[in-house]
Amino acid sequence: MPLFENLGFTSHPFAKTNADEEPNLADYFVPPPFFDAVIGDPSTPSASVVLAPRGGGKTALRRMIEENAIKYRFLPVSYDRFEFSTEQNLEDVTLQYHLRNIISRILLAYLSYLADFPDLIRKLDKPNRRHISLFVHTYLGDLTGDKLQDLLKELKGLPSRFRDFWRDNVGFLESFVNILLNKFDLERIDFPDIKQEEKNLTETYKHQLEYLCGLVRNLGFSAIYVLLDKPDETELTGNDPVATYQLIRPLIRDLELLGLEGFGFKFFLWDQIEPTYRLDARPDRVHQYKLNWSREALQRVLSERLKAFSGGKVTSLSALCENGAPYDIDAAVCLLANHSPRNVIRICERIYAVQAEQDATASRLSLSSIDQGILNYCEQVATDTYGEEVVREMQRIGRELFTINYLANDVFKVQANSIRNRINGWVATALVKQVGTVTVPTSKRPLNFYCVIDPAVVRLIYRRVKMEDFLKDLWLPCEFCATDNLMDIEHFPDGNSPVCCGCGRDLF
């Protein structure tokens, strides 16, 4: 019997970290910050930008907006696949590129719903029926059954019956246009006429969107929500935030487009693009939200997941620990996850993997598998994020609080300027943060004081300390801003009060 069954689960609860790969996400979804604000009011839709780190819940939020589409009466159109020709580069990506992709998806979603009401299109007058036929020829003309299925996978907000309908009625290599023309009794348009009409269409993309919105409203929807996600995951953007923003810039900076009546453009974006986006941003016109999960919220995420995968039998990791947990394991996992729902799953998966290696027949998690799994995760995420050399430097420093002079004189034995440059690099990657200044007897002026703020790296610095002692000695929640500080206050020089890394207020 698999370990997950021994532990009381019906399936592996930590096998997937990508929200798009979790078919039952709604069963254990915990609304992230600003969930209601991002959905907004479909009767008066508006554009919004959601910024979050990778693994911060952007795609889960998008999925749940899709899930609520019928309840709120809007048509969800996901746009998370960006295809490029062989010679195309980011400089070639224009507003027209995006609008053509968006119109294709809206049209397919509209026609899918029409499959339930084919008489609606037959009742339209001849000019409107020809207009729809032209849309079909222009935007879906090259679709065959295989390409159609790829596009339908992207439109995750469509009820599954529509995907099943098209799969059953369009052959793998069959022309989708022919099926549509026959099903809806639409006019066939000759190739020369199509080319001439296409030329006219390309000059009126926004008018086309307004026209499609009118058709969609005839189906009973209040608005169209365009949900743009994953622009940082293409072959042309990768890990480059500047390239990522360049891809979406023609779309996100067009305020006329984003303000189109009947449309709600929702952007789910990697937060590393923010410095570049800020140059164009108009927060007075486009609402902007940052997803920042508290530890308590992550504990709810973890608990709901455990319950969903166990039929309600398992509610916490601590309950799975053999001989009782000497500390709150769920809180520790969510503390070290650094505000990331995905990291919560990654830590739990590491614990599960270590336990399976130790004893796959166990019905409880051993304390050693929990501690080792957490350390394995910390090593992996720290190395992936900052590189092996930086991790070695942090462990060489041996503490999370320091001044430039301390590192220069007591640790690395180099000039202060060399350390200053190194610290600037750590600050740029959000590994280290300045937490005010301190006074010391050896300096006439206050010295900048720095703290390692990535909890995974702090755990590696103190890896020889038992987890329960690590939490007892270093974990200092701030009563003002709820920041979970991990610091040994003994490292604050005499006469200097320990302060919070988040708000800078005194911790005592």
Where do the PLM segments sit?
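Amphipathic alpha-helical segments of the small helical/lid subdomains adjacent to P-loop NTPase cores
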Residues: 2-9, 126-135, 292-346, 351-355
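Short amphipathic alpha-helical interaction segments
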Residues: 413-429, 433-436, 491
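Short, amphipathic alpha-helical interaction segments positioned at domain boundaries
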Residues: 446-484
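Winged-helix-like regulatory helical subdomains adjacent to P-loop NTPase cores
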Residues: 331-420
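Walker A/P-loop-proximal flanking segment of P-loop NTPase domains
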Residues: 1-96
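The catalytic "switch" region of P-loop NTPases
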Residues: 204-326
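P-loop NTPase nucleotide-binding core
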Residues: 53-222, 474-480, 484, 496, ...
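P-loop NTPase catalytic cores that bind/hydrolyze ATP
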Residues: 94-116, 129-131, 222, 327-361, ...
